[in-house]
Amino acid sequence: MRWTKSSQPRKQRKAFFNAPLHKRQKLMSATLHPELRKKFNRRSLPVRRGDMVRIMRGDFKGHEGEVVEVDLKRLRIYVEGATIERANGEKVYYPIHPSNVMIIEPNLDDPMRRKIIERSGGTPEVEAVPEKSEEEKEEKEKEEEKSEE
């Protein structure tokens, strides 16, 4: 996302770090599931609280959960179930960058969000994306067993 006419990396970084909230919201985009891409006729959507996402990278790779919080200041999201334990035993959400998740079931309660999808030529009615097939689950279990050895 380019805000300034300058091509100097220094000024691009400054614009990025000092971006206002309405521009930070655009930076919080995540890719859509391939089935949703066809249905919505777009590649990505900004992440919102209530979206169901699948984590694609990092320690929680493969985990699916609902977005609990979107932190625009730190450009991170918090997903239900992706928690770590502090030294005192308290469970806290692990911050995840939205580029590392895939939206599998968007929250379409907001009429403005529906309009965004309609504008791009998609249909905003959505059913849940089917779960991973049994074969994929078995392959994942085998990979986990190999990594434990």
UniProtKB/Swiss-Prot annotation:
> Record's PROSITE patterns?
RIBOSOMAL_L24
Q: Where is this region: Disordered?
A: 114-149
- The cysteines joined by S-S bonds are none
UniProt lists compositionally biased (Basic and acidic residues) regions at: 129-149
Keyword RNA-binding carried by entry: yes
Which keywords belong to this entry? Ribonucleoprotein, Ribosomal protein, RNA-binding, rRNA-binding
Under InterPro entries, the record lists: KOW, Rib_uL2_dom2, Ribosomal_uL24_CS, Ribosomal_uL24_euk/arc, Ribosomal_uL24_KOW, Translation_prot_SH3-like_sf
**What are the record's GO terms for cellular component?**
large ribosomal subunit
Q: Can you tell which superkingdom this protein's organism belongs to? A: Archaea
| Coiled coil region boundaries | none
GO BP term, pick one: translation
Q: Name one GO molecular function term.
A: structural constituent of ribosome
Known Pfam families for this protein?
Answer: KOW, Ribosomal_L26
Role: One of two assembly initiator proteins, it binds directly to the 5'-end of the 23S rRNA, where it nucleates assembly of the 50S subunit.
Q: Which family does it belong to?
A: Belongs to the universal ribosomal protein uL24 family.
Assembly, in brief, is: Part of the 50S ribosomal subunit.
Instruction: Please report the name of this protein according to its UniProt entry.
Output: Large ribosomal subunit protein uL24
In its UniProt entry, the species of origin is given as Methanopyrus kandleri (strain AV19 / DSM 6324 / JCM 9639 / NBRC 100938)
Q: Which gene encodes it?
A: rpl24
